[in-house]
Structures are given as C-alpha cells and as structure tokens.
Design a protein with these regions (language model features):
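Ser/Thr-rich low-complexity repeats and stalk/linker segments
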Residues: 1-254
Length: 254
C-alpha cells in the first residue's frame, strides 16, 4: 500500500479477510514526508476473495479493498471517516464495492426507523461518497446501510454525544496476546456517551487512541485495537476514558 498521511504521526492498519476476521494489525510510523509505504506477507493461510484494509490516524479513518486470487470485488463496505459527529453537521459516507454498481444508502436511527434514503452508484474503480446533512438529527446512535440484492454492509455512527459516562466497566476477550493479534473489548458505561480508547505499551507510550460511543443501553464494543506485529513483550494497558471517568485493563504480550 502506498499513499500519504499526516506527517510525524503513527498510522494504525488492519486487514480483514473475506470472512471479516482481522488477519493483520500494524502500527506504521509516518515520518516528516507523510509518505505511506506498507507491505505484509502473503502466505498460503490467506483465503481467496476481497480483503478490507483500514487505516486510522487520530480519529480519521480511510478504507480500501483489495483482492487475492480473484480479479473482482465480491462484497460492499460502507464507512464514515469518523464515528462521532456534532449536531447539525455533515457526514461523508463512503461506499466501496464492485465498479459501476448501484446501491441503496439508508440512514436508520436506533429504532431502525429510516431517516434518509438515496441511490448511489460506485465509479469505475468501485467507490463513491455521499454527504449526509445531519441537521435536525437528535442526539444518539445511527446506522448507515448500503445494500442491493447481492450485498449489504452497515456502519454505526453517533450524532451530538458528549463525554462524561459515569462508571466504566469493560474486558477483553482474552488477556494473553502476541504481535499482530487483534483485540476485541466489550463493556458498559453511561448511555449515549463518547469514550476514548487507548492502547499503552510497557514504556507508557500510547500506541493507539480513538473514539467510540455507547448505545442507549450503555453498551459498547470495538475490534479496532490490535497488537503491533513488532510489539515488545510485557504488560500492556487498555484504557477507556470519558471525561473524568476511566477504567484500565492489563493484558500481556509475549
């Protein structure tokens, strides 16, 4: 992968296989040039199909598709450049999939009531972006759904949420990891709150940091964390914070 990013800031990269399993996670240092150059080993364990590469820097995310063993995309991915939006702002929703293909793009509220719907069509390289006006959207969690008779994908986002969640509890699905492993965390906090999730190495350096949100029941989960492939052994820390409220979980990398 080649491209550009903000200079002098680390870039988080994850790769999902056709079964939506994260098979690779890396932290890529970006120097003053802002240039991205990334390679990963392609082994026989990789199955044929369409893979999803997600790059995150600060709270901005970009997604791209690539194929192994086939020449065409056989899935759709919908994503937003970030997860949390101010009230009365605008959200850019991107759809990736087979080239020159029509999809219905729906915006649904938490009760699956349709707030907005339109038809979009991918361009010759399989992408399109639509700007949704969030004026009049009440505070809460929403879903962007891209679909046609063959494919469907969903991305959640929030509008008008604030920090300060009250008590936070969460856990990771396991406590022992190796370099390149994906981390899934699941937890609870105050309803409709923004959380900052951080991964901290044994030297106290923050390796990854991003925002997520709780739903109206106060639950949250994310698989956007991962151990860098060249990670040092030792005790790492996962931290969830919302305003003055915070919770830490210790994991071991070996």
């Amino acid at each position: 992968m080649t491209g550009t990013a903000q200079p002098n800031k680390d870039l988080s990269l994850s790769i999902k296989d056709p079964n939506d399993t994260i098979v690779r996670f890396d932290i890529l240092p970006i120097d003053e040039s802002g240039e991205i150059k990334y390679e990963f080993p392609y082994t026989q364990s990789f199955i044929e199909g369409t893979y999803v590469l997600t790059a995150t820097q600060d709270d901005i995310t970009q997604v791209s598709l690539f194929t192994l063993g086939t020449d065409s995309y056989d899935r759709v991915v919908v994503y937003l450049e970030k997860m949390n939006f101010f009230a009365n702002s605008k959200a850019s929703v991107s759809v990736l999939g087979p080239p020159s293909t029509e999809f219905t793009l729906d915006i649904l509220d938490y009760g699956d009531n349709k707030k907005f719907s339109t038809l979009v069509k991918t361009n010759s390289v399989g992408s399109t972006t639509f700007v949704v006006d969030l004026t009049g959207y009440s505070s809460g969690v929403y879903k962007a759904v891209a679909s046609n008779p063959l494919y469907q994908d969903t991305a959640k986002f929030s509008v008008g949420l604030s920090s300060g969640s009250g008590n936070i509890t969460f856990s990771s699905t396991k406590l022992q990891y190796s370099g390149g492993d994906n981390i899934l965390i699941i937890g609870n906090a105050g309803a409709n709150s923004i959380l900052n999730i951080s991964l901290i190495d044994p030297n106290g350096e923050t390796v990854t940091k991003f925002e997520i949100f709780t739903d109206k029941e106060g639950t949250f989960s994310t698989d956007m964390l991962g151990i860098p492939s060249n990670a040092m052994d030792g005790e790492w820390q996962i931290k969830a914070q919302s305003g003055l409220d915070h919770k830490e979980v210790i994991i071991t990398v070996s």
